[in-house]
Curated annotation (Swiss-Prot):
It is found in: Nucleus; Chromosome. GO terms for molecular function: DNA binding. Signal peptide: none annotated. Clupeine Z is probably the result of a crossover between the genes for clupeines YI and YII. It comes from Clupea harengus. Residues 1-31 are annotated as: Disordered. Disulfide bonds: none annotated. This is Protamine-Z.
Length: 31
């Protein structure tokens, strides 16, 4: 599953997990 992030690999960014996030916002960020 890490290979799927190869597209974002060009941008070094740490995986951030917000403490409280609405399920609707999560579905919107899941592109």
């Amino acid at each position: 599953a890490r290979r799927r992030r190869s597209r974002r690999a060009s941008r070094p960014v740490r995986r951030r997990r917000p403490r409280r996030v609405s399920r609707r916002r999560r579905a919107r960020r899941r592109r």
